[in-house]
A protein has these predicted regions:
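Mature catalytic core of soluble alpha/beta enzymes
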Residues: 2-7, 17-353
Length: 353
């Protein structure tokens, strides 16, 4: 699913530490077309973290740079961009790893979150290429070349002995249209998880990683759960945190937190609003009263995927999905006769503003 990523606004500011030994630090930088920030406690699982702050920041920057070089659809020299252009590429560990995750997400969401629908996103103007208002015939034509079900489940089976991957070799039917992939629905969540995994590896236990999506664990500097604000889904609300719908505390333990919505990327044609959330099952932008979906899940990639999933299937199905999925909590903001209303799952406590 192509969509704009909404940073769940960090409400809790770094303040006094929990204990005399705690030392919370923060650094930020640029990645994946935007900014990122990492906040964590230098007092880790086994005492003070041995690496200095600059070394940690350099390692995080290296991870994000490597992911961008592999998976960015906007970087024309990335492995993904060259693959989508029909070139034979040498897939790295990130390319292989996220492909496997995307295939799992495709299956778990019943083909709703489909990384192999990149041409469909492009034709509507919400992908890596410009486009606007395709004809129904064009939509059907483009859909015939989409779908993870056309591709092998294990990308490594398509990699040649010399380590290269030809796009045609990924097809189940090699005579089909070569695939094009778009990981916008999971890439930033995936990046959060990768950075968090690195922080765990050096002993960090209390952290907040924000790369347009959020991963957090442990507690904030006050010894309390991390506080997250949910933006009010007002068209054109691009100033994150300026207009909040509600605030909630993230449950204890490691969690990804992702908000998806249709209020920051859309266009209007002949008086009708076309949102950037596309349903790959029919090829058209969704039209329903669900304005935003905030998902809390065990990791950021899954939260990312499920937030997109909810924005496709709408309010009623999203409620059923969240209530029936173990380890997942959610907050849905919807339009009820011109008023913003919220629904929250049982394990998610909100303070509405």
């Amino acid at each position: 699913m192509v969509r704009v990523k909404f940073t769940a606004f960090l409400v809790c500011l770094l303040a006094l530490s929990c204990t005399p030994k705690d030392r919370y630090v923060v650094f930020s930088g640029y990645a994946q077309g935007g900014t990122y920030s990492v906040k964590f406690n230098m007092n880790g699982r086994d005492g003070m973290i041995s690496q200095d702050l600059q070394e940690i920041k350099d390692s995080v920057d290296a991870i994000l740079t490597a992911i961008d070089a592999s998976l960015s659809g906007y970087n024309k020299n990335s492995i993904l961009s060259r693959f989508n252009a029909g070139e034979t590429v040498v897939p790295d560990s990130y390319f292989i790893d996220i492909y496997r995750s995307a295939y799992d997400v495709y299956n778990s969401t019943g083909a709703v979150v489909d990384a192999a629908s990149a041409p469909l996103f492009d034709v509507w103007g919400f992908g890596f290429k410009s486009g606007e208002m395709p004809s129904s015939d064009k939509v059907m034509e483009v859909m015939s070349g989409c779908g993870m079900n056309r591709l092998q489940a294990d990308v490594t089976m398509a990699v040649s002995g010399d380590g290269t991957l030809n796009p045609y070799d990924l097809l189940r039917d090699r005579n089909g249209v070569p695939p094009q992939l778009n990981y916008n629905a999971i890439a930033q969540g995936y990046s959060c998880d990768k950075v968090a995994r690195y922080l765990y590896s050096i002993g960090v236990k209390d952290m907040m990683v924000d790369i347009g999506e959020i991963f957090c664990d442990g507690v904030n500097p006050k010894g309390m759960p991390w506080g997250i604000g949910i933006d009010k889904p007002v068209d054109g609300n691009n100033d994150m945190g300026a207009q909040l719908q509600a605030i909630f505390k993230v449950p204890a333990g490691p969690h990804g937190v992702v908000t998806s919505g249709n209020y920051r990327k859309f266009y209007v044609k002949d008086g009708r609003k076309y949102a950037h959330t596309i349903d790959p099952r029919n090829g058209y932008p969704v039209s329903h009263n669900l304005l935003s979906a905030t998902i809390v899940a065990p990791d950021a990639l899954i939260a990312d995927a499920y937030a997109t999933y909810c924005m496709v299937i709408g309010l009623e199905e999203s409620v059923s999905f969240i209530e029936s999925t173990p380890g997942v909590e959610g907050c849905l903001v919807y339009d009820d006769g011109g008023e913003f209303k919220t629904w929250t799952s049982q394990g998610m406590t909100l303070s509405e503003l």
